């Protein structure tokens, strides 16, 4: 590997990452995105490369994103191909606890802080996919959403298996997600007070 490098910052406008009003997510039970001992927690190009095959297959089946499970047991929810995962269970906001295979996303951090400031209880834990699907069916899980720099927050309408089994969320367009999104955008755009000193003014 090279012993020198050049640090560059590119600023460019971008279109919306996901434009659909009804987002369907494929539960990936075959492939693995990141393995223990690797670079799964880092923001590297290689992590995206590992998800491309599954993402292309999911797109062909009509899905917008892929939900990845842990590599070893395919039981614990990790993240989506380019975004972190959240779910609202009985009014409590849940997100997978960070591991060496889950990205410590900056948008994830911001949303946790915003949710706490808005009075929501936050739980970071190892979320089992089997338990979540049961909670969606019994309506104790009312919404799921994903977040990232490009997309900010995207509500999930359905979680789907390869065999066609689908699990529809009560709030397919988000409720808590909408509140968190509007708050974060308000801070970014200067309409709401930036109490966390997240925004830097460039002159």
Predicted features by range, described:
Residues 1-203:
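Helix-start/capping segments and mature chain N-termini
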């Amino acid at each position: 590997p090279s012993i020198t490098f050049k640090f560059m910052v590119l600023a460019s406008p971008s279109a919306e990452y996901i434009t659909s009003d009804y987002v369907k997510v494929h539960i990936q039970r075959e492939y693995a995105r990141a393995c223990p001992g690797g670079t799964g927690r880092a923001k590297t190009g290689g992590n995206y490369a590992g998800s491309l095959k599954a993402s292309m297959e999911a797109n062909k089946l009509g899905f917008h994103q892929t939900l990845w499970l842990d590599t070893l047991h395919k039981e614990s929810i990790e993240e989506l191909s380019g975004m972190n995962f959240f779910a609202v269970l009985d009014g409590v906001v849940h997100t997978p606890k960070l591991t060496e295979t889950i990205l410590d996303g900056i948008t994830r951090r911001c949303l946790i802080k915003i949710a706490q400031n808005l009075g929501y209880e936050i739980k970071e834990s190892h979320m089992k996919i089997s338990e979540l699907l049961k909670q969606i069916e019994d309506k104790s899980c009312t919404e799921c959403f994903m977040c990232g720099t490009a997309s900010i927050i995207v509500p999930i309408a359905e979680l789907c298996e390869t065999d066609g089994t689908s699990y529809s969320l009560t709030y397919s367009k988000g409720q808590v997600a909408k509140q968190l999104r509007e708050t974060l955008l308000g801070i970014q755009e200067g309409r709401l007070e930036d109490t966390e000193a997240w925004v830097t003014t460039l002159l």
